[in-house]
Amino acid sequence: MEIEVPVSELRKNKVFVATPMYGGMASGMYCKASCDLATTATKYEIDLKFFYLFNESLVPRARNYCVDEFLRSDYTHLMFIDADICYSPEYVLTLSALCSEEKPIIGGPYPKKVIAWEKVRNAVDKGLGDDDPLDLDKFTGDFVFNPTTGTTQISLGEPVEVLEVGTGFMMIRREALDAWREAYPQFAYKPDHNRSEHFTGDRYIHAYFDTVIDNDSWLGEGNSNNSDRYLSEDYMFCQLARKIGLTTWLCPWMSLQHVGTYVFNGSLKDLGRLEYAAHGADMKHRPYVEERRKKIQNTTALKTKKKGKRK
């Protein structure tokens, strides 16, 4: 999707980028992206500030501290970016342009830290790795969002309304946070003293983000969907936001990466089942490609034949 917005309009928004950083650690890809974002904002004279919260092991509490820091500032838009997300700086400017009264909560899709092997298998069956096996990496993701009820397909070229979107890459308007706080006064709490200037244990802040069970016992009558789902802190925030008319949106064209660890498996015994095992530089030999295609064709023909018999 292409969005043309005058720089003068982007300058009207003051973006507060908040990153909870447990252990004070961030991925190199996040650091590079953030340097690029700072450079881009400076180039176009956009007021953008980074805030890092170190060594808070409880993620919901870290997010609530970040919100409180934002609300005590004069910035207009809160941008959550987690320390393990790789992104394009243009995406932040895009969210800033789109985040409005109509779209007060908006984010980008990033993959969960899991490989969806069934999708890789389906991509192989469709021949999407025939030209370049490295292309199969594009089909490994399960994404952090939930579509609205009844949605069967989405347009990749425009923002789409969703039930929930992850805070790993989410922008929120100040007015949305104000409305949320007024609607749910019961979530005010006194944070523990954490040896910092603004969190001394003698004032209230708000729990915009918390992990809850989605039922009336936890959230109060009328605030839950009684699904008994265990809601993560971002999904809880989105669900309660939607209850008071604050819509949540996703930009499906954005391509984000989620950095994590992976245990690399495999054995020579298992490779032996292939009879032919290519080495890393061999991207051309496909000894089983015709065998696979014939198998798929035969399976398709068999299914068609069975359908014909039923008639």
Residue positions per predicted region:
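C-terminal catalytic/acceptor-binding lobe
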Residues: V5-F16, E182-K311
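Active-site nucleotide-sugar/metal-binding loop of Leloir-type enzymes
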Residues: N64-H77
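Short beta-strand-to-loop acidic/aromatic patch adjacent to the donor-nucleotide binding site
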Residues: Y75-C86
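Short, Asp-centered acidic motifs that coordinate Mg2+ and/or phosphate
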Residues: H77, P104-I105, T248
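Conserved catalytic core of nucleotide-sugar-dependent glycosyltransferases
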Residues: V67, S88-L219
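Active-site acidic short loop of glycosyltransferases
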Residues: K12, S73-T76, E101
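Anion (oxyanion) recognition and catalysis
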Residues: T42, S100, R242
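N-proximal low-complexity "stem/linker" segments adjacent to membrane-targeting elements
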Residues: M1-S57, R61, A301-K303, K311
